[in-house]
Amino acid sequence: MSHKDRRGNSSNDGSSFKLNETFTSSEVEVKPTFESMGLREELLRGIFNYGFEKPSAIQQRAILPIIKGRDTIAQAQSGTGKTATFSIGALQCVEVNVRSPQVLILSPTRELAQQIQKVALALSEFMNIQVHACVGGKNLSDDVKKLETGVHIVSGTPGRVLDMITRKSLPTRHIKMMILDEADEMLSLGFQQQINDVYRYLPNGTQIVLVSATLTQDVVSMTEKFMTKPVRILLKRDELTLDGIKQFFVSVEKEDWKFGTLCDIYDSLTITQAVIFCNTKKKVDQLTEQMRDANFTVASMHGDMVQKEREEIIKSFRSGENRVLITTDILARGIDVQQVSLVINYDLPIDRENYIHRIGRSGRFGRKGVAINFVKNSDIRILRDIEQFYSTQIDEMPVNFASII
């Protein structure tokens, strides 16, 4: 056995850290440009072709440790460029002439796994690299066929990836890196055992990259199991709310008043695109029906819809065909919709840690955005808790809000 025992033990030589530690390892270099990272020429072309000019804060710090083969913990939330961070790191390490999976990326939802595939394919446009999305809701035989042709990177959900590995359709002997994206969400959804099982199939010494918006105790425990002397790139909590996003709340005395408030906001804004979050599938359906009855054009999406339908809805929203999308937290994790300028929390998130994921839909990469929270009298305590948790201030929305957005 090497330093990483397939039973899930790791002799990490004091590299574990406490939950409240929020620092970046002193060894982390800041690379101000992509050119200074020593990346392949064809990968650089893909990066610039994708529209990146200057690396974001997380990219400046995390790409180098990843391409140097270090186990890496990156605390980063939606809108920071984290997907491109680990995608660039993975693409730099792939040997193009080895037509077998070399990088495995696990994420909590099908949509996120497919989004990661799209980003990796776009960045590798000039590299002749095959990236496959291995997710549930699709025909097993399609996965088997694609994997048989030889792919370099697999982006998938833990259940389907484990299924493919146990069927011997996804060979693991050449895997050199496993990336765990949205690790906090994967654990909260109960994927811990499946991730452990996938890990046991990997070669000894596989590099682990873990990305998480929040470092819960479960995430910290996972790093201690899987990682050896990880490089840590951690942000202080008060840096977690994205710059450039104005946050407001609107007092609505009771639930019945929310709809009228939403209609008022809809009328007074020239919105590029907006996402409206509700806490339940039932509420999404009810609100969608109400909005359509009032002659507003809206789309809606939640987890009860079949995969194909969800993909069509995201596609039409991305293309701008639908301006307003009503959804549950299924969209709050990493679906990159560039034009979103407004997020409305019709319901405050049940889990305060989801607040950052929801408002991260707007203002991506420096684009300005607005988050509006509907707050019933009984929600005031939750709002204050969110403010305290993120060391941020959420102001009451002024009467002339349309002019300051």
From Swiss-Prot:
EC assignment: the record states: 3.6.4.13
Q: Name one GO cellular component term.
A: nucleolus
Q: What class of enzyme is it?
A: hydrolase
Give the reaction(s) catalysed: ATP + H2O = ADP + phosphate + H(+)
In terms of Gene3D superfamilies, this protein maps to: P-loop containing nucleotide triphosphate hydrolases (3.40.50.300)
User: Which InterPro entries does the record match to this protein?
Assistant: DEAD/DEAH_box_helicase_dom (IPR011545), Helicase_ATP-bd (IPR014001), Helicase_C-like (IPR001650), P-loop_NTPase (IPR027417), RNA-helicase_DEAD-box_CS (IPR000629), RNA_helicase_DEAD_Q_motif (IPR014014)
User: What keywords would UniProt list here?
Assistant: ATP-binding, Cytoplasm, Helicase, Hydrolase, Initiation factor, Nucleotide-binding, Protein biosynthesis, RNA-binding
Q: Where is this motif: DEAD box?
A: 181-184
Query: Can you give the residue ranges of the Helicase C-terminal domain?
Result: 244-405
- CDD domains per UniProt: DEADc_EIF4AIII_DDX48 (cd18045), SF2_C_DEAD (cd18787)
Q: Do the record's keywords include Protein biosynthesis?
A: yes
**Which Pfam families does the record cross-reference, listed alphabetically?**
DEAD (PF00270), Helicase_C (PF00271)
Which terms under GO biological process does the entry name?
A: mRNA splicing, via spliceosome
User: Which of this chain's residues are annotated to bind ATP?
Assistant: A76, Q77, S78, G79, T80, G81, K82, T83
**Entry's localization field:** Cytoplasm
Family, per entry? Belongs to the DEAD box helicase family. eIF4A subfamily.
Functional description taken from the UniProt entry = ATP-dependent RNA helicase which is a subunit of the eIF4F complex involved in cap recognition and is required for mRNA binding to ribosome. In the current model of translation initiation, eIF4A unwinds RNA secondary structures in the 5'-UTR of mRNAs which is necessary to allow efficient binding of the small ribosomal subunit, and subsequent scanning for the initiator codon.
Its name, as the record gives it, is Eukaryotic initiation factor 4A
- Tell me what organism the protein belongs to: Dictyostelium discoideum
